[in-house]
């Protein structure tokens, strides 16, 4: 059992303030909001953590991982899960990962684009979620294309449905549940980014980081992460070692 001091550093308000990002369809990272309720892998993990710590869970809902990053960096949020990259590591401290994501592009119905390499061309308009690891990787790997950032997966999905853009950047697992909503759209094979979805806490809270890491590792070992992925519809997903 963690010490009272460790718990206080992780949750100084007496509540576990857990940050989650929502989208129109679930992924290994995004939760979905329906009828005033949020569901998803990250929600299941945070609920379990709060139960183990014997404290209430205060879920904080955001449109994208960039917003969650800023909330954690300011200390407004105690714990979250998000894709790792060097830019984020300047703002939050990362613990272990529970899932490895790979980002690619979706192209709308009728598109002539067949590969990720073909996206990196002048005149190609890429739509990505603002302040995310995927948007930063798209800028780095497709310097010849034009990158337009939008605030939410919901807006990206709506633009893809209308064909308002040439390539839409997200992780493969996000497209598993989004693709059925976009008739004629295709997901390009391969990836332009791979990273882990890891637990994160505010910087300079070493006891909080250690405790968060222990909770996640226990969730992986106990099968909780696997069950949460299964419940979200990702029965073939592999838990990160």
Predicted regions and their residues:
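Ligand-binding cleft/hinge of the Venus flytrap
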Residues: 28-35, 46-56, 134-152, 179-180, ...
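Flexible hinge/capping segments at coil-to-helix
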Residues: 98, 107-125
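Periplasmic-binding protein-like
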Residues: 99-110, 172, 176-217, 235-241
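Short loop->beta-strand "edge-of-pocket" segments that line small-molecule binding or catalytic clefts
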Residues: 14-22, 38-39, 117-134, 146
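Extracytoplasmic small-molecule ligand-binding "clamshell" domains
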Residues: 1-83, 222, 231
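Short helix-initiation/N-cap motifs at beta->coil->alpha
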Residues: 58-70, 113-114, 148-162, 195
């Amino acid at each position: 059992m963690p010490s009272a001091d460790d718990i206080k550093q992780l949750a100084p308000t007496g509540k576990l303030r857990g940050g989650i990002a929502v989208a129109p369809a679930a992924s290994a990272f995004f939760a979905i909001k329906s009828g005033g309720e949020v569901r998803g892998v990250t929600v299941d993990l945070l609920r379990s953590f709060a139960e183990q710590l014997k404290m209430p869970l205060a879920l904080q809902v955001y449109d994208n991982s960039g917003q969650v990053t800023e909330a954690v960096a300011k200390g407004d949020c105690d714990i979250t899960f998000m894709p790792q990259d060097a830019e984020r590591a300047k703002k939050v401290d990362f613990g272990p990962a529970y899932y490895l994501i790979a980002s690619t592009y979706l192209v709308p119905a009728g598109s002539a684009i067949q590969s990720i390499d073909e996206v990196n061309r002048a005149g190609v308009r890429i739509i990505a979620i603002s302040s995310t690891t995927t948007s930063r990787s798209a800028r780095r790997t497709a310097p010849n294309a034009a990158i337009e950032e939008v605030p939410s997966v919901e807006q990206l999905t709506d633009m893809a449905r209308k064909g308002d853009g040439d390539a839409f950047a997200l992780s493969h697992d996000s497209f598993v549940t989004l693709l059925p909503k976009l008739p004629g759209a295709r997901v390009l094979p391969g990836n332009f980014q791979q990273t882990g979805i890891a637990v994160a806490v505010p910087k300079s809270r070493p006891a909080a980081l250690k405790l968060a890491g222990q909770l996640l590792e226990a969730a992986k070992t106990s099968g909780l992460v696997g069950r949460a992925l299964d419940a979200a519809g990702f029965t073939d997903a592999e838990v990160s070692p």
